[in-house]
């Protein structure tokens, strides 16, 4: 059975995007964090995105900038199978990308029944839905030392409390802190 994990950057006030859906505040990396991110992203498996994150990621990872900045990661991002949850997209020209057509939980159950572990990147609403459905095996948070004063909060509106057990913590010189959690 495949595991489903999620990686998301959060502000100190719990937002994954500001009030204008901007996430540029989350992209400052020092060399140590860049190496960590690169090695973390090289793993195989399946990627899961919501439409908004997909539309942000596709032009970068299929373009020349990604190939120059992070060639190994770009190769992996383009080669790995990808599932995109969207109510408006019907097709994709990004290699190995499938638009989810079944209901959310059925799609995640099918992914878990497969052989490839899957990782949700960004896509805050998808992360919250997967956690609420009990389908998230691991939550990786990059805590960024900024307060946004408003925006899209990761777990706003979830119907019940979810307990998490900390598995790992890593601090970077730029002030970012990576925390790995499991349900429990």
Model-flagged regions — what are they?
Residues 2-135, 145-184:
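Portal/gating segments that form or line small-molecule/metal binding sites
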Residues 142:
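Non-cysteine beta-strand/loop elements that form the S-adenosyl-L-methionine
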């Amino acid at each position: 059975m495949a595991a489903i994990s999620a990686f998301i950057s959060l502000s100190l006030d719990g937002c994954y995007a500001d009030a204008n859906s901007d996430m540029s505040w989350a992209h400052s990396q020092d060399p140590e964090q860049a190496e960590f991110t690169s090695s973390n992203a090289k793993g195989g498996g399946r990627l899961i995105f919501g439409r908004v994150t997909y539309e942000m990621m596709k032009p970068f990872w299929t373009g020349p900038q990604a190939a120059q900045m992070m060639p190994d990661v770009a190769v992996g991002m383009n080669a790995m199978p990808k599932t995109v949850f969207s109510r408006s997209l019907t097709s994709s020209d990004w290699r190995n990308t499938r638009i989810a057509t079944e209901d959310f939980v059925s799609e995640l159950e099918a992914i878990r029944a497969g052989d490839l572990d899957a990782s949700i990147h960004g896509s805050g609403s998808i992360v919250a839905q997967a956690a609420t459905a009990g389908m998230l095996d691991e939550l990786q948070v990059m805590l960024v030392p900024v307060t946004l004063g408003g925006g899209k909060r990761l777990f706003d509106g979830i119907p019940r409390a979810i307990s998490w057990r900390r598995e790992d913590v890593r601090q970077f010189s730029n002030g970012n802190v990576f925390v790995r959690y499991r349900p429990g």
